[in-house]
Every structure is written in structure tokens, then in C-alpha cells.
Amino acid sequence: MYINIFHYVLREDCDVAAYHELSIAMYEVVTKNAEYEFVGMERFGDDYEGVVLETFESLEGAKRWSRCPEHRAAMKRGRAEFYERYEGSGTVVDHDYQFDRAQLRSVDQFE
């Protein structure tokens, strides 16, 4: 599994509605194409600054997404119209874990 971490700050004069429309369009592209091995996305922040965590099955899938023509055009538009600045990083997940209280039969299982 591979996670891309993207932190952005939008320009003060940014058309936030247009930015969100473009984000939705890119989400539709990445989710409809199995070649990108997209797992999911979490977004945190407000209208002008945020962090996006994108999860892919593999680094290779994330690289294919970074080369997607629609995504490349969106990145170019983002630099021209929306972003004041951004930074990204990625990491391969070496382990993961989960907890789901609903799957327990009783609280006694915690002890």
C-alpha cells in the first residue's frame, strides 16, 4: 500500500467553487480507472488550506495516476489558478492495523 500526503494553501483570490469542481472531477477519474489502484481519500482542512491523504494499492498505481493526462492538466491548472503553495510526500505502508468495536461480542474482550 502507498499513501500520498498533499498539503496545500490556496490563493486568496482563488475560485474555491471551481477548485472543488476540479477536485471532484479528478476523484471521478481516479476511482473509475482500475489501473491507478486507488483505495481511498481523506481530506482535512478548510476552504483555503488542507491536507489530502490518497491511498493506493501500490507505488506503481500512484505513479500511473501522477502520469494520467487529465491529472497532469489539472495539476497545471492548479498551479496557474488555485495554489499559493503546496507540498507533497509519499510513503509505502509497511504495516497497518484496525479496530472496530462493532465486531466485539462484549467489552470484556478488552481485558
For each feature predicted by the language model, list its residue ranges.
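Metal-dependent phosphoesterases centered on the DNase I-like endonuclease/exonuclease/phosphatase
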Residues: 75
